[in-house]
Amino acid sequence: MRVRIALQVAAASLMVGTCFAAAGAAEAAVALAPHRAVYDLKLLKSHGKRSIEAVRGRILYDFTGSACEGYALQFRQVSEIDSGEGKVALSDLRAATWEDGDAKSFRFNSENKVNERAVETVDGSAGRDGSGVSVKLSKPQPKNFDLDAKIVFPTEHVRRVIEAAEAGKSLLELSVFDGSESGDKVFSTLAVIGNVIAPGEKLPDDAAAGNATLAALKRWPVTISYFEQGAAKTGEQTPAYSIGFELYENGISRALSLDYGDFIVSGTMSKLELKDAAACK
């Protein structure tokens, strides 16, 4: 199973402007809120070729920083997947990233274990200049490669989604590099943005409920589909996975829906802690 969230909700998922790569950090129009959130996972639906009996798990999402000092993310997703007939797999994905406020530098490190055995470790960095993006991997194997200048990093991605939502747009297509999986993949993404949910409408029933800061903010239902670049195109493309959530204008996400194709997992925000943002000097 591909157990992951694009570091938008977050990455991602959870996190998901004009081009912030060219804007000064102090001029960034979207202010992302430092916060720590916990999401409880459970199986919502199972269909297709792979039958999943149950999914239990949790996501810990710890986002800190500012446009001036850069953004850091500590992410952990632990999932127990029961495929029936006594076959249970425990997946433990840990990731740490840092992205500067101008979206010119990005560092990433992740480790994925299945049944306590490491199956994937990635470590690397990416830097943007006028001509493109250069990536240096130290794990899983040393490797250097270049990417198109149009690709965006995870925090920049969420800022672009929020900016598009604020502008009343319903679709946003971007190529995203988040250092996930083998560390060398770029995903073509399509964000579908629903109608704005104004403060006081459709009150949340999770940890966001009663939070005075969030109660005063707009939010949007968003679904982001991730397509592997370079995959064979035969008719209508099927996304590698999709992430649905409600996105607040400060970057906090709730009501997650992780669609892996053969099954869908829901993520309910069970804890939320807002942190103070450091003032730009």
Segment roles from a protein language model:
Residues 28-34, 62-71, 98-104, 213-216, ...:
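A short, structured loop/turn motif at beta-sheet edges
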Residues 41-45, 61-67, 79-83, 97-101, ...:
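Beta-strand elements of well-folded, non-transmembrane domains
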Residues 54-59, 90-94, 118-122, 238-242:
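Short, surface-exposed coil-to-beta transition loops
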Residues 1-18:
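Bacterial N-terminal signal peptides that target proteins for export
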Residues 75-127:
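Hydrophobic/aromatic-rich structural module bridging two neighboring secondary-structure elements via a short loop
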